[in-house]
Amino acid sequence: MALSTPKTLMDFFQPAKRLKASPSSSSSFPAVSVAGRSRDLGSVANSPPRVTVTTAVADDSSGLTPEQVARAEFHKFVAKSKSNLAVCSVKVTKAKGLILIMDLVKLWVYPSMCLKEKSPSSLLNIFKELHKDVGDKLHMVYFRRNKKENVSHVTSLAVEDVTGITRTKG
């Protein structure tokens, strides 16, 4: 088999679709080419393929050395990461400032205490059974809209913290 032309690593991978290719970014990284031979069973013990590393020269128009270009790009990426950190920290502080309505309102013990209509007995039995096991850490939200809206029961059970709770037979 004939020797193939040396290829760089960039020849094996497609460029990223979202990143913009800048001529300065490709010139700051060394180009690695692999010159491999075809191997048959007899040549397995031979040495691995040769790897040649060449550094690309920066644009003559910029007048910067490759080291200066690499340093400038590094500082550009550091500045961008600091900007992203500032934006993300603002978003996190806003998210921490949001308080759920359930934290502000003392929830009722039984759904019928909130609603002036009778709750389904099966739902109350489930709630009472869980309330015995969990205690005051169990909250229940129960909505019932009228039949004209075609909305059936919406039920939500929320348990605050159940670590260390064990069921005892009584």
From Swiss-Prot:
GO terms for cellular component: mitochondrion. Coiled coil: none annotated. Keywords: Mitochondrion, Transit peptide. It is found in: Mitochondrion. It comes from the Eukaryota. Its main location: mitochondrion. Residues 1-53 form a transit peptide. Probable inactive paralog of AtUNG (AC Q9LIH6) generated by a gene duplication event and subsequently disrupted by at least two transposon insertions. Belongs to the uracil-DNA glycosylase (UDG) superfamily. UNG family. This is Probable inactive uracil-DNA glycosylase, mitochondrial. It comes from Arabidopsis thaliana.
